[in-house]
């Protein structure tokens, strides 16, 4: 393909692989020097997106026969004008996916959830911002917002009925959920809490770990739990999670850690009288200049995560302060 593979899904019978791609659209494929070709607009989109249109890309899904290696395009992004495809699930032989396309006026991206029926896309939901589709207790779920740009509402787990009606899985859970997965009938999810990103057992409502870290992904194998995690002073590594503790099993950044000095943070939650502000600081000396980083939010946050800019500032002799005055997403 002339593009990139964004995601993939093994079919339930393990005979096929569904591959999500981002490729040049049909019209743009014929241009020899793609990098120098300008874009022409008759009207300016309300919001420039980075998902495809300004790069002339379209999202497709291929079905690959694992035995023969042959493939067929089952979702044609050019035909349906799909800018990108985020998540894909299979249930009872039906493919359901979340995807982006522009509205009828061409002024705004719409995120939709639809399923494939006789090579046609039947939309289930069209108003929100959703991805990370999964089935739990034989019902379709997604992580996201019911309405686009519904900030500062937290992203959460939403449940869909067959008619497309949406309800909250955890209505009273007031933290930002970023990823969910079902393993052995248990629903696990990552959520943000005051600068941390932690892993939670949704069935039992308990955290598998409570440390000042950011967990970026998780997986299960042979009864073991694995996470990709980092902290304020340590970059990403793979860890096995054992009784609430991290056991490092990868060496991806060992050389970096051995050769580059990193600094841990001082954390304070500052009460202004009207709200509480999560704040992190690196102190290198009282006679040193200070850089204040204020997060615009509320769609993201500074936190207990490895950020090379802060480490670079500190190495150059600056004190560093980073805060979330509009609220951490967790």
Predicted regions span which residues?
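Conserved beta-propeller blade repeats
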Residues: 2-20, 26, 48-54, 77-104, ...
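Predominantly five- to eight-bladed beta-propeller fold
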Residues: 22-64, 100, 110-112, 156, ...
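Structural motif
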Residues: 27-30, 58-60, 104-114, 150-158, ...
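Short loop/turn segments that connect beta-strands within beta-propeller blades
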Residues: 65-69, 116-119, 161-164, 202-204, ...
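Flexible loop/turn segments at secondary-structure boundaries
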Residues: 82, 104, 129-132, 148-150, ...
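Serine-hydrolase catalytic core recognition
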Residues: 219-224, 228-330
